[in-house]
A protein has these predicted regions:
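ATP-dependent carboxylate activation and anion-phosphoryl transfer catalytic cores
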Residues: 1-145, 160-161, 172
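Short secondary-structure boundary/capping segments
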Residues: 113-116, 179-181, 200
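Short amphipathic alpha-helix with an adjacent loop that forms part of the alpha/beta core around
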Residues: 144-158
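Single conserved hydrophobic/aromatic residue that forms the stacking wall/gate
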Residues: 202-212
């Protein structure tokens, strides 16, 4: 069992809490595994945590994450194993993965993240390609190298078994993805076209409505 030592930029005001979390690591992991059986986790996500010194709380979740290049390299074997396990659960026949990226791949930080993500997938034993959803010269148009033929999506003659979205679809879901037979992860309905922070704010129950 490989365990990592958490390092926080802000010191805990209660060191006992930190020690309890570390000592209960196996029980915490077991609880998460049980929850993931009941509520399957997305292929990937990132969570922003806020450390106030006496508690740590999640403040934001991203279903189309970047920042893979910031992960601890000493834990790479765990990332690769997670990729293998998650994809093999979909089908043992999977071999080819297409990552549909954001249109700002010239952003050096995003490019580093994408390179790292591709590396994890390749080391997990899969063939992987990536492409922007938008055309390089006109991002409002669909990438001309993405072709849909008989509901099968291909990119430069590369036919993926799974399409991995790393694009939040804030500009909408294009027909080329709506009509694709291949499995798309995360689901198209998870894009920002169907979600809104404003809607979440106004549809969430008031704290006063929650039972004590």
């Amino acid at each position: 069992n490989i365990q990592s030592i958490a390092r926080y930029s802000k010191k805990f005001s209660n060191e006992d809490l930190h020690e309890i979390i570390i000592s209960k690591n196996l029980e915490i992991e077991a609880w998460f595994r049980k929850q993931w059986i009941k509520y399957p986790a997305p292929f990937y996500s990132s969570i922003d945590l806020r450390n106030s010194g006496y508690k740590i709380a999640p403040v934001d979740t991203n279903l189309f994450p970047a920042g893979f290049n910031n992960l601890d390299v000493s834990m790479e074997s765990l990332y690769i194993s997670a990729v293998q396990h998650t994809l093999e659960k979909q089908s043992a026949e999977l071999t080819k993965i297409l990552i549909v990226t954001e249109n700002h791949t010239r952003n050096k930080f995003y490019s580093k993240s994408l390179t790292t993500l591709k590396s994890f997938i390749e080391k997990a034993g899969f063939e992987v390609q990536s492409c922007m959803l938008g055309d390089e010269c006109n991002t409002e148009a669909i990438n001309k190298d993405l072709v849909l033929n008989n509901s099968i999506l291909s990119y430069k003659k590369f036919i993926p078994d799974i399409v991995l979205l790393n694009n939040d679809l804030s500009a909408g879901v294009p027909d080329i993805l709506k009509n694709t037979k291949q499995l798309i992860l995360p689901d198209l309905h998870m894009g920002w076209t169907n979600r809104s922070k404003t809607c979440l704010l106004y549809t969430s129950p008031s704290p006063r409505d929650d039972p004590l």
